[in-house]
Regions:
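Long, amphipathic alpha-helical stalk/connector segments used for oligomerization, subunit docking
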Residues: 339-342, 346-350, 355, 370-419
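Short, charge-patterned binding micro-sites
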Residues: 55-61
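A charged helix-plus-loop insertion that forms the helical arch/lid used to bind
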Residues: 65-78
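A broadly conserved sequence feature marking short terminus-proximal activation segments
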Residues: 76-132
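Cys/His-rich short segments
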Residues: 120-175, 179
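Structured secondary-structure scaffolds
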Residues: 2-53, 105-109, 155, 160-376, ...
C-alpha cells in the first residue's frame, strides 16, 4: 500500500474527529501521532500539506454526559475540545485545522450536503425498530449483541430498545457502486485485514441507515423536519469537508472542495472502519463528489498484554505519560514498537528499555562522543572532507546512499516501524565503524586524513538519520541538527520547505565541510524504570 499521489502537489490527511464524551485516551493520541508523522514527512518532501483533526460534538451521549456533570452541552464540548487541543500541543502535533462539528460554518456545510442528497432522492422517512447503543450512537443487529442485549464494544452498557420514525439514507442503493470501488481500487481500504472485514460486511447486503433522531435536542435540526435532529455520523463525517474551508471564506461546498479535495488519507481506529469505508463513500457518491483516496484502520492498544479499561484500573493517561517522559519518547515508542495496522501493547518496562537503548545509547551517545572527538581532533569544525570523494562501497556511505529511498517506501506504506529499523541500521553501523576504525589510535599515529574521513562519515550518517527521523522525533532531530551547526528547527513548518531542501538533506554526503559545530550535549537523557 502507498498513499502517494505523484500528480497532486497538495496532501490532505485526517485523524477522526474525536467524540467528546470524555477526555482523550491513548488510542486517540496514537492515531494523531501517526497522522502528524505522515504530515511532517510530506512537508519535508515539499508538498503543501493540510492536516485535519478535531472533535465530533453532537448526539444523545454528549447531551446525557453534559447533564450528568451539571453542564450545558456546549460547555461540555468546549471543555473536552480544549483537552484534546492541549494534549496535541504537548505531543508536538502540528495540525493545520481543528474541526468542531458544533460550529455555525459546519452547520452550513451539513445543510448544503443534505440538500444534495435529498434532491437525489436518497433520503426518506421510515420506521426504525431495534436495539440502540447510546455509546456507539447506532442501532445494533442481534448478531452484534452479547447476552443481555449488551453491545460488544460497550459490554458494561445495555442497549436500549427503540421504535421510532427516522429519516434514512439509501445505502443499499450504492451496493454495486461500492463493490466496484473496492475492486477498482484495492488499496482504498488498508491494511488488507481491514479490507477483508469491509468486503465481508458488504457481501452480507447493505442496509439503509438512519440519519436522524427524535427527542434529541443536541444536534442540527433536519432541514426538512425540525422535530428531528441529524444523526451524528451524517453530521460528523462532513466535519472533514468543513475543515477544508479557508478561515475567511464563505461556508459552501464549492469553496471547501476547490483546493484540497479529495482528501488523500483518512487515518482511523478499526472500530470506526465501517463508517469511513462504507457509509462515507456512499454519501459522497450520492452528493456527486469524488471519494477520498485511502482509509487506513489501525489496531487497538493493550497494556501489559491486557485490554485497557477503567474497571480494570489499567488505563493509560496520555497527558501523564507525556508529562513524565516527554513527547519524542512517546512518539518514538508507539510508532517504532507497534506495527501500524496491527494491535499493539504498551509495557512501561519495555518502553523505558527501548527508548534508552535507541535514543540515549545508540543515537545520543554516538553523536556525543563523535562531536567530542571532532572538538579534540578537528577544532570543532566538520572535517575538511567532500562526501563525493568517499568511495561508494564505504560501509556507511553504502547504507546511506540507499537509506532515503528505503525510508520513503516505509513512510508511504505507513510502516513507521520499518522506517525506524532502516534508519537505526545506519546508526548501529556507525557505532560499529567507530569502534573498528578507532580514530583515537589513528590520531596518535599521525594519520589525520584517515581521522577526518572516519569522523566525517559518522557525522554525515548521524545527520541523515536525524533528518529522516524528524517526522517521528522532531525535537531530538532539531537538537542534533543544531549541534551539527545548522540553524534549523524541524517544528517550524512554515519554513521547513524553504530551509531544508529534501533532495539535498535526504542525500548522504551533503554535510558542508568546515561547518562550525555546536557544543556537545545529550539529546536524550536516559529514563529510569518506575
Amino acid at each position: 500500500m502507498t498513499y502517494t499521489d505523484t500528480v497532486r502537489k497538495t496532501f490532505a490527511i485526517t485523524t477522526p474527529l474525536y467524540y467528546v464524551n470524555d477526555l482523550p485516551h491513548i488510542g486517540s493520541a496514537y492515531t494523531t501521532m501517526a497522522a502528524d508523522a505522515v504530515a511532517r514527512f510530506e512537508r519535508l518532501r515539499g508538498k503543501a500539506v493540510l492536516m485535519i483533526t478535531g472533535t465530533d460534538e453532537h448526539g444523545q451521549k454528549i447531551q446525557r454526559t453534559a447533564e450528568s456533570n451539571g453542564l450545558q452541552p456546549q460547555e461540555h464540548c468546549d471543555k473536552i475540545a480544549a483537552g484534546f487541543d492541549a494534549l496535541w500541543q504537548k505531543l508536538n502535533i502540528q495540525y493545520d485545522r481543528f474541526s468542531r462539528t458544533t460550529s455555525p460554518r459546519h452547520e452550513a456545510i451539513v445543510k448544503e450536503f443534505f440538500g444534495r442528497v435529498w434532491d437525489k432522492g436518497d433520503i426518506y422517512l421510515g420506521q426504525q425498530k431495534g436495539w440502540y447503543c447510546v455509546s456507539c450512537e447506532e442501532f445494533k443487529e442481534e448478531r452484534e449483541l452479547l447476552e443481555g442485549h449488551r453491545c460488544s464494544i460497550h459490554p458494561n452498557k445495555e442497549a436500549e430498545w427503540r421504535d421510532e420514525q427516522n429519516y434514512f439514507f439509501a445505502l443499499s442503493k450504492y451496493q454495486s457502486q461500492l463493490e466496484a470501488l473496492f475492486q477498482e481500487r484495492p488499496d482504498f481500504i488498508q491494511p488488507e485485514s481491514r479490507r477483508n472485514e469491509v468486503l465481508s460486511f458488504v457481501a452480507q447486503g447493505l442496509q439503509d441507515f438512519s440519519i436522524s433522531r427524535v427527542n434529541v435536542d443536541w444536534g442540527f435540526p433536519m432541514p426538512v423536519d425540525p422535530n428531528q435532529t441529524i444523526y451524528v455520523w451524517f453530521d460528523a463525517l462532513l466535519g472533514y469537508v468543513t475543515a477544508l474551508l479557508d478561515p475567511d471564506s464563505e461556508p459552501s461546498l464549492e469553496k471547501a472542495l476547490e483546493k484540497w479535495w479529495p482528501i488523500n488519507l483518512h487515518l482511523i481506529g478499526k472500530d470506526i472502519l465501517r463508517f469511513h469505508a462504507v457509509y462515507w463513500p456512499a454519501m459522497l457518491m450520492s452528493a456527486g463528489l469524488p471519494v477520498s483516496g485511502h482509509v487506513f484502520g489501525h489496531g487497538f492498544l493493550t497494556k501489559d498484554g491486557q485490554k485497557m479499561g477503567k474497571s480494570l484500573g489499567n488505563t493509560l493517561d496520555p497527558v501523564e505519560l507525556v508529562n513524565r517522559y516527554g513527547a519524542d519518547a512517546i512518539r518514538y515508542y508507539f510508532l517504532k514498537e507497534i506495527e501500524f495496522g496491527k494491535d499493539g501493547d504498551f509495557s512501561e518496562t519495555r518502553f523505558v528499555d527501548i527508548v534508552n537503548a535507541d535514543l540515549a545509547n545508540d543515537l545520543g551517545n554516538l553523536l556525543n562522543r563523535t562531536l567530542k572527538m571532532v572538538q579534540k581532533y578537528c577544532n570543532a569544525l566538520v572535517p575538511n572532507v567532500n562526501g563525493e570523494d568517499i568511495p561508494a562501497d564505504h560501509p556507511l556511505k553504502a547504507i546511506g546512499l540507499e537509506l532515503s529511498d528505503r525510508t520513503s517506501v516505509a513512510y508511504e506504506a505507513l510502516a513507521f516501524s520499518e522506517a525506524c529499523r532502516e534508519i537505526f541500521t545506519l546508526v548501529r553501523a556507525c557505532n560499529k565503524f567507530i569502534d573498528e576504525q578507532a580514530p583515537w589510535s589513528l590520531y596518535k599515529q599521525g594519520n589525520s586524513a584517515a581521522v577526518e574521513q572516519v569522523l566525517y562519515a559518522v557525522l554525515e550518517s548521524v545527520r541523515l538519520s536525524a533528518y529522516l527521523l524528524s517526522p517521528i522525533i522532531p525535537n531530538i532531530s532539531t537538537d542534533i541538527y543544531q549541534q551539527l551547526g545548522f540553524s534549523l528547527n524541524f517544528n517550524e513548518k512554515t519554513l521547513i520547505n524553504n530551509s531544508v531542501t529534501y533532495d539535498t538533506h535526504a542525500t548522504w554526503g551533503t554535510l558542508p565541510a568546515q561547518q562550525q559545530l555546536g557544543e556537545p550535549r545529550p539529546v536524550f537523557v536516559r529514563l529510569e524504570q518506575a
